Swiss-Prot record:
This is Large ribosomal subunit protein uL6. Belongs to the universal ribosomal protein uL6 family. GO terms for biological process: cytoplasmic translation. The keyword Transit peptide does not apply. It comes from Brevibacillus brevis (strain 47 / JCM 6285 / NBRC 100599). GO terms for cellular component: cytosolic large ribosomal subunit. Pfam families: Ribosomal_L6. GO terms for molecular function: rRNA binding; structural constituent of ribosome. PANTHER family: 60S/50S RIBOSOMAL PROTEIN L6/L9, LARGE RIBOSOMAL SUBUNIT PROTEIN UL6M. The gene is rplF.
Amino acid sequence: MSRVGRKPIVVPAGVTLTLNGTELTVKGPKGQLVRSFHEDIKINIAENEVIVERPSDNKLHRSLHGTTRALVSNMVTGVSEGFTRTLELVGVGYRAAKSGNGVTLSLGFSHPVEVTPEEGIEIDVPNQTTLVVKGINKERVGQIAAEIRSLRKPEPYKGKGIKYSNEVVRRKEGKKGK
């Protein structure tokens, strides 16, 4: 039995779950998320908890069990608390500025880079070298943060680039002189 899949999901106050066939709708104070799941996996909604069950121990059902439980848990957390990813810009002249709905990044290119988030995702700029990506969908928040990071990945010699706030950039020693 999946150790992740066995755990019940505690539903906080103010969050409602609706199961329509294989489609689960989660509504909360921050918004609403809808997702379809595999028809073999059963999602039981009780008063303040959700239990995910599988019909058999075959390989497909075992793999779907923990995955489904994690996805439902992320949906519940997203609509109640939301998710954030913090990025830091390291390097001389690397800065970010809020522009309308999106962000303008100066990353050492000959042109500024415009990043416009999709609906449901918000990018804050607390200071010139920090970006905070916020949203209710964990996958989309992580994906947009990864796309921003990929514009200028941290390099190993000086550490310049865009990195996650908790990321440790492995440093290399430069060439040896004579």
